[in-house]
Amino acid sequence: MTALTHQTTSQLHTAPAQPTLSAKALLQSDDEALARMLLTHCSECANALMTSLLKGCDSEHPGVEALRALLMVACATTEQEQRRARNTLECMFILGTARWGRKARSEGVASFQLASQRWIGRLLQLPTFDPDALCALFTGQGAYTVVIPGSPYWPESLEDLDVRSDWAPPLALWVQGDATALTSCDRPVSIVGSRGVNEYGRHVARNLACQTALNGHLVVSGGAMGIDAAAHWGALEAMNQLGAKVAGRTVAIFAGGLDHCGPTTNMRLFEQICTRHARVSECTPSTIPEPRRFLLRNRLIAALAYSVVVAQARLRSGALNTAGWANEMNRRLFAVPGEITTPAHAGCNRLIADQQASLLSSTSDIEQLCHETHAPSIRP
């Protein structure tokens, strides 16, 4: 994987392709997955402006149509062609905004114009416009599976991120491991919390995740130290006990490209997850996990879940951001109570006191969290 990582990163920074000479094959491509990979690269993950553009497309392959519209602007050789292509692009955005339930005001159109210029600039910096080469580049030479809307492995719950026009669902998901883990359970449980935890929090997260997976349910978390790692290890423990046919899976959601998974102290965990579970990101390979991306990642952890559990959290923990997303999307939110004299539990205690979350009173009796026991829906 190290060699693939370096190769992918370096290729993205080589000399740009010449659009008017080499974009023809890409313009003719009807590969929706490739189009969404490139649109994700252009917009640096999902945002509301790109989603409006996609909603303004009328074809069965909105990603392909949106990419072609951007390429037509990039390839225009005369002022008239440029004006016509930009007008088409803006009309798609305005239509998509209306379909999303809003009116495209002048400031919104201006924001789209600036954003689309950046997107086109990133397209022009691609090292090639050859579809096969781009597909190899953006899948880490085949190391990652790309899942898009319409795929049998696309979690339908992500569409709840579409209910407000200032949110945006991911354009695609990059998966390393078993992509079927994403849809292996109808009502997944997300377990989140602080990185710096005590033994109580670690025990609660691991035991709760193990019990959840022992009943065939999917456990979702963020791959970080502390509560996240404990939750993933708990799900792995369940598989060691019951085997792959019965135990539920675990999915780790990352804030950057899958070639930038961290922390390094969790590498053994990540290797285990890749066997029969899944590492997932909405970002293209080589994307650096900047601080703002962790907050965006939290919305995916909440959206994937039927129930969200905050196992242990301080008042300023990022897990409270995930809890906020969960409440916005009407997920069932639970918090584990702790000592009122310990700052490590203050976030959970506040959620319970403010009636933002239900109190979770047991890690062994999970009936209040999960539906009936089932075998995971996975490929043979």
Language-model segments: residues:
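Short, small/acidic-rich helices and loops at N termini and domain boundaries
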Residues: 1-151
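Glycine-biased, small-residue-rich flexible motifs in mid-sequence functional cores and linkers
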Residues: 1-36, 41-44, 132, 141, ...
